[in-house]
Amino acid sequence: MPKQTPTIKDVAAYAGVSVTTVTNVLHGRGHRFSEETRQKVLRAVEALGYRPNQVARSLVRRRSYTLGVVVEHFRGALLGNPYFSTLLDGVLAEAVQAGYQLKIIALTSSDIEHVRQRTEDGSIDGAILAAPLHQSPLLQWAQECPLPCVVAGSSPPDLRATCVDVDDENAVYQGVKWLIAQGHRRIAFIAGPVNYWSAHQREQGYLRALSEAGIFITSHWIRRGNYSTESGRWAMEKLLQVRPPFSAVVCCNDWMALGALEALRRRGICVPEEISVMGFDDVEAAAVASPPLTTIRQPVREIGMRAAKLLIQQIESGTRTPERVIFPGELVQRDSTTAFAPETADTSKHPAAVRRVRRRRTY
């Protein structure tokens, strides 16, 4: 005799809660139950192998139970991009828990009519705009979209839409302040692409920290990359030609920092004894770099999860009051940075050569 398919009533009985509570948990209505109750329901779902009838739910509620994730200027390597793959992982985790699936809407341009055709055809219940470009027409679309919409990452502060992001400006500001406290005064910066708001904010954090410390800011210490390892190598080669030499460099993302490390290694420049290097993101490769990379961690997966949760709440409640959720960055100290001792400076090896007091690792 075939095993009977478990129902929502079976889940409720197993967890010792009402059917309504099970429904609220599966739909992500977190304000209506405790975390303990949520875990009981999820354990019951797993133990019984319960799967909601997606087709029946869609017919009854006239929903697709699908979240759209919109990515503009797609170049064919979405899952190979650590930022987007991690963001999607967070979105997917929250969506599946609430009984939703994902539809990736990869655009080769920022044409609003194109995105409307792909999102307003009834195939999705709401959209997450993933790290849009600065001044992208899609930002205007996010504010006017007839569907619930959340912007995840690289969101301008004046956007009239629900946004989930990291405090890019303050994160880099705190990182540069930490380097200054370690004795560094000549700090270079490898900036990101001008078409991302997040890159602009990180550069502003760098400039603010130097300005507040009374450090003269020279444009010669700033080179711009495109977030790739190769652009980080190129930028570092250019920076090594600058006079006066710098003692530390902050990079707008980890991949450019890894490229900078490679350029220094090719020149025979020791990190951190001669130049300290700091990145941003804390990708997996940062921890296994040589030396392990000091960086600023942003909670990309958590950003994706919160964006999906807020979007589902908008879909389920029918309300769309814009809100802005900002996560702090976190400095992760590894071996690519150390304290600077100006009295022991030695430029005999190359323009950027200096000696430093070695510090004990702290985490």
Model-based region annotation:
Residues 21-23, 61-77, 178, 186-193:
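Short beta-strand segments enriched in small/hydrophobic residues
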Residues 39, 48-116:
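Amphipathic helical "hinge" segments at domain boundaries
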Residues 60, 119-120, 143, 180:
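Non-catalytic positions within long, well-ordered alpha-helices that form the structural scaffold/packing
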Residues 1-3, 14, 47, 88-100, ...:
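Bacterial carbohydrate/catabolite-sensing allosteric modules
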Residues 120-126, 243-247:
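Short acidic/histidine-rich motifs immediately flanking catalytic phosphotransfer sites
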